Amino acid sequence: MRMRKMRNLEPRMEKCAAYRIDRPETLRGSWRSLKPDCTALWVEVGCGKGKFTAETAQANPDVLLIAVERCREAMVVAMEKARDMALKNVFFIDMDVAKMEEIFAPGEIDRLFINFPDPWPRKKNAKRRLTHRAFLDKYCRTVREGGEIHFKTDNAPLFAYSLEEFAACGLEVKNVTHDLHKDGIVGIMTGYEEKFHALGTPINRCEIVCKPFVLPPEEKKQTEGKEEA
C-alpha cells in the first residue's frame, strides 16, 4: 500500500508501541505467550489500515491475531484503531512474507488471511504474487496441517492464477466464489473491499486447506533469490 509520508509518524507509532512487536523472531514458537488463553493463532498478511484486522479481533476475543504490514504509514493507522477499540488480542509486525519461517515455527499458525494482495500483473513478476507456489510452500510449513488460508481479491486474473497454483500444489480448495457479496454482505470487509464493492466490483474468495507438499529445490532457491534482490 502506497501512502504519503507522515510528518508525525514517529510520535504516533510511539503512542501505539504496546501493539507493535519490534523483534518478532524472538517469539518464534511461542507467539501464544502473548495471550496464553487464546484458542487459536491467526495471521493476516498485509493488513493495510486495519479495518478488517480490528473488527476480526473484536469479533473473536478468544483468538490471537498477528497483523503483518510493511507500510508504516498504514500500520500506524491500524494500530490506532486497535488502541482506540481497546483490543487485547491483536499485535502488529513489519515482516517480509518471504521470511515467514524465521518468524513462525512449523505448524504454529491456525489460520492465515491474504486480503487483496498486489496482483503483480506482469508475467515476469509472477513469483512475487503472494499465491505463487513458493509462498504457498512457506505458508503450508508455518500453518498447521488442516489449518486454512482465507484468500480474497477483486482481481479476476490473479484469482484464476491462484486457483491454478493451489491445484498444482495439490491443496484442497473450498467455498470458492467469484462474487462474494452478490446476495448481501458476507463476513468482515476490508476498507479496500468496501470501496470496490460499492462500485459493483465482484469480490473473489476461497479457502485453502494446508498440508505439506514438495516444492522443487531449484524453484524454491530461485524464488528466494528473487525476493532478496
Question: PLM features: residue spans?
Answer:
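Class I S-adenosyl-L-methionine
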Residues: S162-E164, C169-A229
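A short glycine-rich, Lys/Arg-flanked "PGG" loop and its adjoining helix->strand segment in the class I
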Residues: T131-E145
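S-adenosyl-L-methionine
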Residues: M1-L41, K51-Q58, E80-P106
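Short alpha-helix immediately C-terminal to the canonical SAM-binding loop
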Residues: M75-V76, F159
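Conserved beta-strand signature within the Rossmann-like core of class I S-adenosyl-L-methionine
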Residues: G146-T153
